Amino acid sequence: MVTLRVDEISNIIRERIEQYNREVTIVNTGTVLQVGDGIARIHGLDQVMAGELVEFEEGTVGIALNLESNNVGVVLMGDGLMIQEGSSVKATGRIAQIPVSEAYLGRVINALAKPIDGRGEISASESRLIESPAPGIISRRSVYEPLQTGLIAIDSMIPIGRGQRELIIGDRQTGKTAVATDTILNQKGQNVICLYVAIGQKASSVAQVVTTFQERGAMEYTIVVAETADSPATLQYLAPYTGAALAEYFMYRERHTSIIYDDLSKQAQAYRQMSLLLRRPPGREAYPGDVFYLHSRLLERAAKSSSHLGEGSMTALPIVETQSGDVSAYIPTNVISITDGQIFLSSDLFNAGIRPAINVGISVSRVGSAAQIKAMKQVAGKSKLELAQFAELEAFAQFASDLDKATQNQLARGQRLRELLKQSQSAPLTVEEQILTIYTGANGYLDPLDIGQVKKFLVQLRTHLKTNKPQFQEIISSTKTFTEQAEALLKEAIPEQMELFILQEQT
């Protein structure tokens, strides 16, 4: 018979009593009533806050968006295929935030800041809220530094400044993404961190953009946030805010950032889908009433910080797609009214071979010449007016049979000015090259050439100036002014190259 060792048993009981810790945890829970289409309705969760993250039994996370009297509408940040009716949900007490660090540079991530480029985890010690308040009036200063895009048409006539919000708007297939990606390529060596946010696009298109960046060495200073067309609507809706949070991290560390949202029409559609499924009342074009706030709270985060905050900046270039040039639709008018100007791309110009297909007439920059260096103002100040007059004259000339010599000369000059604004994709020009190009056209040096020869001559002229007159580039980059000395160098170089070019063409 086994003998009971009373002292041993009493010691074990005493130890257990000493180890007993009476802790009570209060968890705010609920039960899934209904799930489907990326939406779940939850009974319970009485203490949940609007925008709070909730966690389902099987691990999916959602955001509580609709707080109704008898249930809570939650949008799922995932497919939610394993969620079952009747399963429990708990409130986390947190709102959506992402890790942020320098290690994100050169990576492709999703809306939850998880890497999707197969290059391992990203280490980050800090985190930022996905939705944080925009800087106030005192925290900002007016825009005064240029953000060079490398595109003559933009930098000379629709200049963009650091901290500005400039909308790129146009029909599909008019080169909106090309303008944005060229701007990123042109930031090489400019100490600007770029973010490219792809919302609801084809995965192949995003891969193409990433490949271009890698080939041109732009990924060193770029972060790509991608939620493709097959992603849940919730993640497409969140992607721009994730990009903005990363850009803000660098902006508040006294750095310059530029962020491209490609495109906000798709984000609005994802938000419309979520809102209709949550049974929120539809408004114009079936969008919910707060779709303006959706974009305004995103774009207001772009700013030029005041000197107290280190003068960092965040420049936003949102893209919006129009249907057959209709700029008066709901989303285009909303975003136009939020931004500091727009670059309008026209399908007619694109099809006529004018690329980038920028309609200079209705494109504006509300920051204006404050975002240009003095040299560019001196050379390109009248370009927009001259082109507008040329377009008017060209329309009139179609009806007139015999034109006087002055009108013919003005038309010829205008055609050459329009020709020099054409540029190949992924071939951005430096400011010095742009100043040289505009000066050559505006002062009639291109008039003796045929229109077909203009591009070839300009390429040769840029090379000639770089090799034989390097002082020109030094003067512009050091003084930021088009001095008499710089003009004298051009007056020498252009006729020299013109003689060589004409001889070359004759042989």
Swiss-Prot record:
Q: What is its EC number?
A: 7.1.2.2
InterPro entries from the xrefs?
Answer: ATP_synth_asu-like_sf, ATP_synth_asu_C, ATP_synth_asu_C_sf, ATP_synth_F1_a_nt-bd_dom, ATP_synth_F1_asu, ATPase_a/bsu_AS, ATPase_F1/V1/A1_a/bsu_N, ATPase_F1/V1/A1_a/bsu_N_sf
Localization recorded for this chain is: Plastid, Chloroplast thylakoid membrane
| Record-listed ATP binding positions | 170-177
- Topology versus the membrane: Peripheral membrane protein
Q: Which PROSITE patterns match?
A: ATPASE_ALPHA_BETA
The record's keywords, sorted A to Z, are:
ATP synthesis, ATP-binding, CF(1), Chloroplast, Hydrogen ion transport, Ion transport, Membrane, Nucleotide-binding, Plastid, Thylakoid, Translocase, Transport
- The answer, when asked if Thylakoid is one of the entry's keywords, is yes
Q: Which domain of life is it from?
A: Eukaryota
Q: Which reaction does it catalyse?
A: ATP + H2O + 4 H(+)(in) = ADP + phosphate + 5 H(+)(out)
| Cellular component annotations (GO), alphabetically ordered | chloroplast thylakoid membrane; proton-transporting ATP synthase complex
- GO MF annotations, alphabetized: ADP binding; ATP binding; proton-transporting ATP synthase activity, rotational mechanism
Site entry: Required for activity = 363
**CDD domains documented for this protein:** ATP-synt_F1_alpha_C, ATP-synt_F1_alpha_N, F1-ATPase_alpha_CD
Quaternary assembly: F-type ATPases have 2 components, CF(1) - the catalytic core - and CF(0) - the membrane proton channel. CF(1) has five subunits: alpha(3), beta(3), gamma(1), delta(1), epsilon(1). CF(0) has four main subunits: a, b, b' and c.
Q: To which protein family does this belong?
A: Belongs to the ATPase alpha/beta chains family.
Role: Produces ATP from ADP in the presence of a proton gradient across the membrane. The alpha chain is a regulatory subunit.
Q: What is this protein called?
A: ATP synthase subunit alpha, chloroplastic
